[in-house]
Curated annotation (Swiss-Prot):
Its EC number is 3.6.5.4. GO terms for cellular component: cytoplasm; plasma membrane. The gene is ftsY. The keyword Cytoplasm applies. SMART domains: AAA, SRP54, SRP54_N. Belongs to the GTP-binding SRP family. FtsY subfamily. This is Signal recognition particle receptor FtsY. One of its GO terms (molecular function) is GTPase activity. It catalyses: GTP + H2O = GDP + phosphate + H(+). PANTHER family: SIGNAL RECOGNITION PARTICLE RECEPTOR SUBUNIT ALPHA. The lineage of its organism: Archaea, Thermoproteota, Thermoprotei, Sulfolobales, Sulfolobaceae. GO terms for biological process: SRP-dependent cotranslational protein targeting to membrane. SUPFAM superfamilies: Domain of the SRP/SRP receptor G-proteins, P-loop containing nucleoside triphosphate hydrolases.
């Protein structure tokens, strides 16, 4: 189940607090109404008691007119007072506390500082100066503003359809290289991509260019066997670029559609790894570069993304372990700060648990009840 609980809670709490401020006026209005009614009844009773039956009819008529005039004045004053309570213009002072609380909750949900400030600025611009009359109107303004702001962030980058990109390239083989540090689920994600490509009638081959971690080749061999695809591998410590070159050459000779290259992922601060990746890139000349990020890594995932962008560059992101992500802010941060699209999300351990990323899907999950 994918729900992004913490991000949902942040927006829900803000909505409750800002609309709750309007509700405070309702009891006051009802209480004032009751007091005014009681006053009118008392005045009427007093007038009735004070009118002797023996008084002149002309005097009675004058008193009656006087009472009616007084009542009309009171009714007019009451309407003006109720209009004052019914409609309220939202001021910046009304928002300061709830905005600060939302800022803290967004940052705690892995939303970067820059994205948080944009969302809060959009909210203030759309709320301050608005004349609102009821809770539902406040909710509508807040929800529409948040949805628009988040959608704009996520759609700044052109949507990438990987299958269409492969087919329209006219190139065979189409070479895809995968980056990512150890532990992000890179090997499993590559297997999921192979499964997806096969279901779209695209033949594939895997290059095991992570020759420094022995388990990496064994893991890929296991998945390749289950998926019935060819795996090109080298000895432990072999040249990763040579493995990639051999896989591409094999694909050309067998008319294979796509080559998927796994790469080493020790640490993103490892300078030797960066040089190794640059060499693989020079030899393989990939058509598409995908960075694998763990959605549970929070701000560290953003730092990894910055490092790979600055050193080797990439075209798109696949987020893993999204099914376990209770925060949900990393996708917003990636889209806004690095201008990189999230193309797929890993939502489980099965090969079919790879789904396309959609801004509409993301917004729906955040604001679903």
């Amino acid at each position: 189940m994918i729900c992004f609980d913490r991000l949902k809670k942040a927006f829900s709490n803000f909505l409750d607090k800002i609309s709750g401020e309007e509700n405070k006026k309702e009891p006051e209005t009802r209480q004032t109404d009751q007091l005014e009614s009681k006053k009118e009844e008392t005045i009427q009773q007093q007038q009735n008691v004070q009118q002797p039956q023996a008084e002149n009819k002309i005097e009675q008529k004058q008193e009656k007119i006087s009472v009616q005039t007084g009542q009309e004045n009171k009714q007019e004053n009451k309407r003006s007072f109720f209009d004052f309570l019914k409609y309220k213009t939202i001021k910046e002072d009304d928002l300061n506390d709830v905005i600060e609380e939302l800022r803290f909750q967004l940052l705690d949900s892995d939303v970067s500082y820059e994205v948080t400030e944009k969302i809060l600025e959009d909210l203030k611009n759309n709320l301050i100066g608005k004349k609102v009359s009821r809770r539902e109107e406040v909710e509508e303004i807040v929800i529409n503003t948040l949805k628009k702001s988040i959608t704009e962030i996520l759609t700044k980058n052109q949507k990438t359809d990987l299958i269409e990109k492969i087919r329209s390239s006219g190139k065979k083989p189409f070479v895809i290289i995968f980056f990512g540090v150890n532990g992000v689920g890179k090997t499993t994600t590559i297997a999921k991509v192979v499964n997806m490509l096969k279901k779209n009638n695209l033949s594939t081959i895997i290059a095991a260019s992570d020759t420094f971690r022995a388990a990496a080749q064994e893991q890929l061999a296991y998945h390749a066997s289950k998926l019935e695809v060819q795996l090109i591998r080298g000895k432990y410590g072999a040249d990763p670029a040579s493995v990639a070159f051999d896989a591409i050459s094999f694909a050309k000779s067998r008319n294979i559609d796509v080559v998927l290259i796994d790469t080493a992922g020790r640490m993103h601060i490892d300078s030797d790894l960066v040089e190794e990746l640059k060499r693989v890139l020079r030899i393989a000349k990939p058509d598409f570069r995908i960075l694998i990020l763990d959605s549970l890594a929070g701000s560290d995932a953003l730092e990894q993304a910055r490092h790979f962008e600055n050193n080797v560059g990439y075209d798109a992101v696949i987020l893993t372990k999204v099914d376990a992500d209770a925060k949900g802010g990393i996708a917003l941060s990636l889209a806004y700060e690095l201008k990189k699209p999230v193309v797929y999300m890993g939502v489980g351990q099965n090969y079919d648990d790879l789904i396309p990323f959609s801004p509409d899907w993301f917004v729906e999950r955040i604001f679903s009840s």
